[in-house]
């Protein structure tokens, strides 16, 4: 019975997968971009790891790659699933999800040369005494807390940078609302943004996305169009 169940499940899973890919490709064509189930992820993933944007993990998988150009800016969007795999004293393996959500990379129009990291308020806390850290070390760089002009932004986000002037130039007043709007669009949380190497990288935790095989293609398109 178990074998029969597996045999019956595989064609169903393959059919759902085929429907998902077909619908997502149609969504991509409709908005003038491309979609593929797999794609290049290593450089963006490593950039996020180097800047401590992910929780600790030892397994990673990526899917649902959207690429193209919007308003003259290249972009890449895909979903990451990061897990921690452990074994107990009896050798039994278990996996715990540490992060699931979209990774977005955009070719930025404003020229910049430093590194600026934007996180939700309190993401980097001092041990024991609490409060945000005055500086953090990531990717062999020291980023200092940046004092932003907009008090509402400071209440929601912490900004760390190795160029204070550039940080205030890049993170303009309405940026806070844009990040919060992205969180809402994906029903996500803990959004982070990184200005580095001439590109903007945004990640946030969210449930599995773009599963059009579940026949929620309209919602998938809404998420994608909002992001673009």
Please annotate each region the language model reported.
Residues 3-27:
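Transmembrane-cytosolic junction motif
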């Amino acid at each position: 019975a178990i074998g029969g169940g597996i045999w019956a499940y595989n064609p169903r899973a393959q059919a759902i997968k085929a429907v998902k890919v077909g619908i997502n490709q149609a969504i991509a064509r409709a908005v003038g971009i491309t979609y593929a189930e797999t794609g290049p992820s290593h450089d963006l993933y490593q950039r996020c790891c180097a800047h401590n944007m992910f929780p600790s993990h030892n397994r990673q998988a990526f899917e649902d790659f959207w690429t193209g150009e919007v308003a003259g800016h290249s972009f890449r969007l895909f979903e990451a699933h990061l897990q921690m795999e452990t074994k107990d004293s009896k050798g039994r393996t278990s996996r715990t999800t540490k992060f699931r959500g979209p990774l977005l990379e955009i070719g930025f129009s404003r020229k910049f040369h430093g590194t600026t990291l934007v996180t939700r308020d309190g993401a980097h806390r001092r041990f024991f005494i609490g409060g945000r850290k005055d500086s953090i070390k990531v990717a062999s760089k020291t980023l200092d807390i940046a004092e932003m002009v907009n008090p509402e932004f400071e209440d929601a986000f912490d900004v760390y940078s190795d160029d204070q002037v550039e940080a205030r130039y890049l993170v303009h007043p309405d940026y806070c609302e844009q990040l919060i709007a992205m969180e809402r669009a994906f029903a996500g949380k803990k959004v982070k943004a990184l200005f580095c190497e001439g590109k903007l990288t945004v990640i946030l935790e969210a449930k599995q996305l773009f599963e059009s095989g579940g026949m929620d293609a309209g919602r998938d398109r809404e998420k994608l169009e909002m992001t673009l």
